[in-house]
Amino acid sequence: MEKKMKEEEEEPLSPMARAFQEPSIDCGIVIKFGCKTKINPDVIVDSLKLNVFKHPRFCSLLDDDGTKWLRTDVVNVEEHVFVPDIDPKLTEEDVEWFVEDYISSITMIPLDRTKPLWEVHILNAKTSDAEAICVIRCHHALGDGVSILSLILASTRKTSEPEAFSTLPVPKCRESYNHRRGFSFFRLVLVVCSTVRLIWNTLVDSFLCMATIFFLKDTDTPLKGKPGAIKKFSHRIVSLDDIKLIKNAMEMTINDVLLGVTEAALTRYLHQSYDKTNEEAGTSLTPNRQDLLDRIRLRSLIVVNLRPTGSQSIADMMAKGSKCRWGNYISVILFPFTIALQSDPLVYLSNVKSMIDRKKNSLITYIIYTFSEFVIKAFGINVAVAFQRKIMLNTTMCISNLPGPTEEVSFHGHPIAYFAPSIYGLPQALTIHYLSYANKMIISVAVDPMIIDAHKLCDELEESLKNMKLAILEKGLPNHVN
């Protein structure tokens, strides 16, 4: 009995959690909520007092060497909730700048390790798309985006049905070859070919991953920065129905559409950046220079959730032996973008579709996760972090996509207008997070403001989506939304 109590009080950090809290990375998560009403801080504090002890990570401390969670029976919630004074004379535009600067400033201050590693910041000021802002900041060692989002959604209810929990989109199951009728020999050939392709793709991806660790670097562009810079956080809300329209017309997934939009936006942003540089220098974009732009190597780390399905219930994640797993159960894909202006915006979608289909037919995500755990156990956390940091330094950006509630939700009487998750601590100058919410898609960007114009990049992402929608409508492609 005594041993069991000690195990509950002391829990080892997972290998990925240990990596995230190392000083050379020290990665954190920020989630910005836009509320449709002013936020009552007392309601938030009372709710936290009732729920914080239900979730072990949020009432635990890191031990001195950062290898174990130590359960604490005392959490002073008031010390975790901050309500800064905001000048009531500020305009909506000024408030939006204030919110961006405020979030940037708090991410530069390390979380206090003498208490659980989370904070809540309440900004009761009106912006263009919300009456008030709530910012949750926590350490990535507590869990990945799926874990934290699942925890937050467990505390929300549907605005239309105050007693009902929020619902998430259910992934559609694809029909397996095993359930299709046909000549058995033909099915056998398909299985053999598919297996060979899977092995080949995995070997190629493994080689590219190792090459990136040791020598393969992305081209230096106006999107590639240096580690240690302060991050600026911005977001843009677009129509999820527009994305679904493109998805159905092009017969692809929402993830495919978002990658196509990203490739188009990055291309537009880079070409305009180089055009501006040439104008300032009094030169033109020569054919040789154009050829150089077309040969840019620009890769993103796409974060992949390794759980069986998308966001999980907290009960499932906390259950011992569960396959859902609370914590940092994620891996990455190395995804190359093609930087070339296209007269037809739908070409961007075709480009990413062929590449992501090949990446899906590979075991590289599981190999990277298993390899990271092996290196930590065999050679120590410093070697593993050095490898992870090298991959991030030699690539340009990071992308994540999370499914959110299918209907509007409220938190203890506060209807939520949007969720905007992001991350800080990575050495890359750019991260993009996509999150669906009701009939919206929220695009969140975190950038090094000395290198990248966050608002300009958001403009390009929004414009690229509009161009693709117009191209679909002009070509008369089937455009039903579901």
Swiss-Prot record:
Spans through the membrane: 196-216, 329-349, 367-387
Class of the enzyme per the UniProt entry, highest EC level: transferase
GO biological process: one example: triglyceride biosynthetic process
EC number: 2.3.1.20, 2.3.1.75
SUPFAM superfamilies: CoA-dependent acyltransferases
Reaction catalysis annotation: an acyl-CoA + a 1,2-diacyl-sn-glycerol = a triacyl-sn-glycerol + CoA; a long chain fatty alcohol + a fatty acyl-CoA = a wax ester + CoA
Keyword Membrane: yes
Pathway membership, UniProt: Glycerolipid metabolism; triacylglycerol biosynthesis; Lipid metabolism
Acyltransferase found in the keyword field: yes
Family: In the N-terminal section; belongs to the long-chain O-acyltransferase family.
Protein name: Wax ester synthase/diacylglycerol acyltransferase 9
Gene this protein is translated from: WSD9
